[in-house]
Amino acid sequence: MSELITTPVETTAKAELVSLAKLGEMRTHVGMVKRYWNPKMGFFIEPERKHNNDHFVLELQRQSLQTAYNYVKEVAQNNGQILFVGTKNDYVKKLVNNIAKRVDVAFITQRWLGGTLTNFKTLSISINKLNKLVEKQAENAADLTKKENLMLSREIERLEKFFGGVKSLKRLPNLLIVDDPVYEKNAVAEANILRIPVVALCNTNTNPELVDFIIPANNHQPQSTCLLMNLLADAVAEAKAMPTMFAYKPDEEIQIEIPQKQEAPRQVVNRANSKQITSQRLNITRNPEVLTRE
């Protein structure tokens, strides 16, 4: 593992990557409840712990973000392979899927399969199989029977689920970007074994020694995760001369829609109606003296 990188880098003369005000508005500085903290993250946490949750020092957060941004940009400029990983929940899966496709890099949003990196040869076999099946379906669809087409489509769908995001990988990635290194511990562990640099959003419960480029941040709230992961994707976009979404934009142009939790409708059971319905279903007539079935 390389040494922890916490020193800010020299930035260009252009506008700041993102303002402290916007970081605060998106609650990127709000960590986890104090009892979950990892003492090794203490360097990034406000010393005056006045809140129920630990809070990150915003200036340190911005410096770390700029350092990570510059490194991601450098890797992309050198045609390095970058892999985004986010499997924690439906929101993160959709987010990672969208941003990776936006900047045309590999991604994994389904369950991390053991050996994805450490046994890359086996992964390559699955990727080659998927690519050949897609090619076969495109070229020979008219010559296949309806049943053969259906079976082929099902096999492609199964492989796409796990390998669709990495089918462009021709070699091991040069950089791994994860939204939560605690949840994605298997991916981080494999990257560490192979000495692949890791960029990660590290909450207060993270062991920073496992991550090369730490971004101390709230990775449990959608608006924070969305802002920071998109900024890392913008580093790739800038390197490829593609449009960026949030990087170096004024605050008023950074709009993030916060998803609302949809509560399941309450089912109110009317016991009287329930008994009545049950009686009707069983075709039962109640008599004070005897219970008979009509």
Swiss-Prot record:
GO terms for cellular component: cytosolic small ribosomal subunit. The keyword Metal-binding does not apply. PROSITE patterns: RIBOSOMAL_S2_2 (PS00963). One of its GO terms (molecular function) is structural constituent of ribosome. One of its GO terms (biological process) is translation. The gene is rpsB. Keywords: Ribonucleoprotein, Ribosomal protein. Belongs to the universal ribosomal protein uS2 family. This is Small ribosomal subunit protein uS2. Transmembrane segments: none annotated.
